[in-house]
């Protein structure tokens, strides 16, 4: 009987610690998402935008497919994420299929041949598309995290 009571107590403590740990993780992820969203809105650098997007995607990957998920919205976000990753994938410092980095790299290599307004337009495209992706994931996850 004594053993059963002690075991129950230990299990109850472990249950509380586990539940509290996931709540802390949820709060940490929520806070990090808010920080990244603010940085995304304030940053004017294309490389920083891409770095922020990858970090937001990492957080999204932790929570997608869990209970209470909106399957249709996640399918849309997954499509956007996969498209983004395909366009920005870098392997050993070299763009996999060109994509965003190919555009920016080509612009940097041919800087003399490409007008400044074209370079600026390409960078603005990277920044705006990345901000849209970050905002979409942010809105979805913040809504989902409020449910918990």
UniProtKB/Swiss-Prot annotation:
Residues 1-23 form the signal peptide. It is found in: Secreted. A humoral factor that may play a role in stress tolerance. Belongs to the Turandot family. This is Protein Turandot Z. Keywords: Immunity, Innate immunity, Secreted, Signal. Its main location: secreted. InterPro entries: Turandot (IPR010825). One of its GO terms (biological process) is cellular response to heat. Pfam families: Turandot (PF07240). The keyword Secreted applies. The keyword Nucleus does not apply. One of its GO terms (cellular component) is extracellular space.
